[in-house]
């Protein structure tokens, strides 16, 4: 073997192939000498760099192909009305001034790493908030701060799931949940929310989909994309299913203050102490602070059997070092200050007026129906398939974008079961919202005529 090494090394040196020389030296040092050639770095033989197989089942249509088409149109000089993302600041919904001022005052202390779970003061503020929500037994150590709730959703799934594990996720859902389950190696199993029952979870359907592989139930309440708000009796039925089958309940409550018509949100984690709950929330929606990336995750309920899972969460929190410090500094002031969201959702408030306007304009269109949202920032209207025979709702959305320069998200992007819905954000001012809905109505009128039977 030594003779072979000298021979091939000499040939490589003579040829000036120093890459092969270095490679053979490594092989010899490791006791694995073999002839090998370096893969060329230029030319037609370059191996394509492909994404991980872990991403094969991951999809996030809110920022999907239609958005790419929209960006291209904007680059070409077209002005669009974007009703695809609940990004409040771009529509003139600014964060409270005291939050911004407090972040600025604390910026000198934001240069270093914080504790991996977050600074003490904002976590204590979150603990007090859980007490206001009547979630019992939460300690500082049960609270994790993150770069938005989205980061913590992914972390929670990574810490829980093995290949083949199943998680019950609503249909329609906020698609990050489905994507996070898939990325972690799990299988998202979608339980139906019933449009005829104001988008309430179908408990019988949920029950029928529990198997020995089921690990958890995801509850998005208030719901994105439907705007549904779940009453106590529904929440108690979900808890009972989790209790019977030993499942974790993940509660996404990011819209828990964006409530209309005097509705009140009840946290599912406040209704039992013998089930493990993971509750996620943040500043993005209630405090119009999407870009601050300030969210939190709270572990509550029966934690005795979850020590290993919690250890995994601690490990993952440490691996990402910490959440951004400026966003953490915003939390205490936000939770303890004046709740200006109330001014936006009460009678005369901008969000309430725009919800009512969007609802009327959409439901006045022939063949369009919609459950009026009780919460959140979205409409999820249905298009009568007899009038709008849509086979591919992504193509439908792209056609609307091309013809009327209005950007929406198709219903199947939220894992809905049929191509007969879309989601609309009602954040633009009344004039722009009226313009957008008028364009949608014009497009649908043409679509009906083209597909008339």
What are these regions (language model features)?
Residues 26, 270-349, 359-361, 444:
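Conserved core segment of the aminotransferase class I/II
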Residues 45-148, 155, 322, 334-337, ...:
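N-terminal small-domain helix-loop-helix segment of the aminotransferase-like
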């Amino acid at each position: 073997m030594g003779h072979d090494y000298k021979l091939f090394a000499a040939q490589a040196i003579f040829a000036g192939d120093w890459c092969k020389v270095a490679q053979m030296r490594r092989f010899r040092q490791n006791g694995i000498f073999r002839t090998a050639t370096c893969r060329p770095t230029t030319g037609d033989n370059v191996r394509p760099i492909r994404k991980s197989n872990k991403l094969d089942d991951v999809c996030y249509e809110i920022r999907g192909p239609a958005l790419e088409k929209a960006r291209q149109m904007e680059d070409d000089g077209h002005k669009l009305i974007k009703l695809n993302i609940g990004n409040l600041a771009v529509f003139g919904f600014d964060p409270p001034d005291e939050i911004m001022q407090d972040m600025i005052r604390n910026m000198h202390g934001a240069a270093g790493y914080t504790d991996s779970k977050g600074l003490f003061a904002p976590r204590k503020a979150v603990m007090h908030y859980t007490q206001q929500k009547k979630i019992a037994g939460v300690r500082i150590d049960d609270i994790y701060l993150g770069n938005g709730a989205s980061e913590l959703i992914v972390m929670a799934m990574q810490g829980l799931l093995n290949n083949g594990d199943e998680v019950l996720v609503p249909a329609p859902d906020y698609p990050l949940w489905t994507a996070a389950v898939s990325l972690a190696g799990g299988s998202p199993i979608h339980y139906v929310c019933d449009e005829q029952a104001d988008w309430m979870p179908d408990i019988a359907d949920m029950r029928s989909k529990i198997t020995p592989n089921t690990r958890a139930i995801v509850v998005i309440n208030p719901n994105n994309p439907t705007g549904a708000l779940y009453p106590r009796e529904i929440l108690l039925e979900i808890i009972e299913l989790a209790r019977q089958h030993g499942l974790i309940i993940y509660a996404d409550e990011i819209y828990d203050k964006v409530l209309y018509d005097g509705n009140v949100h009840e946290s599912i984690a406040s209704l039992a102490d013998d089930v493990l709950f993971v509750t996620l929330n943040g500043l993005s929606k209630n405090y119009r602070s999407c870009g601050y990336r300030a969210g939190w995750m709270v572990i509550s309920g029966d934690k005795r059997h979850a020590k290993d899972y919690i250890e995994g969460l601690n490990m993952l929190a440490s691996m990402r070092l910490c959440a951004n410090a400026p966003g953490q500094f915003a939390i205490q002031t936000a939770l303890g200050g004046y709740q200006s969201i109330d001014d936006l959702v009460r009678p005369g408030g901008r969000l309430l007026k725009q919800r009512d306007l969007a609802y009327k304009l959409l439901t006045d269109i022939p063949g369009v129906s919609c459950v009026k949202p009780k919460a959140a920032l979205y409409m999820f209207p249905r298009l009568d398939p007899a009038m709008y025979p849509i086979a591919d709702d992504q193509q439908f959305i792209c056609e609307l974008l091309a013809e009327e320069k209005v950007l929406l998200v198709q219903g199947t992007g939220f894992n809905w079961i049929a191509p007969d819905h879309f989601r609309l954000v009602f954040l633009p001012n009344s004039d722009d919202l009226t313009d957008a809905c008028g364009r949608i109505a014009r497009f649908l009128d043409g679509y009906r005529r083209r597909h008339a039977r």
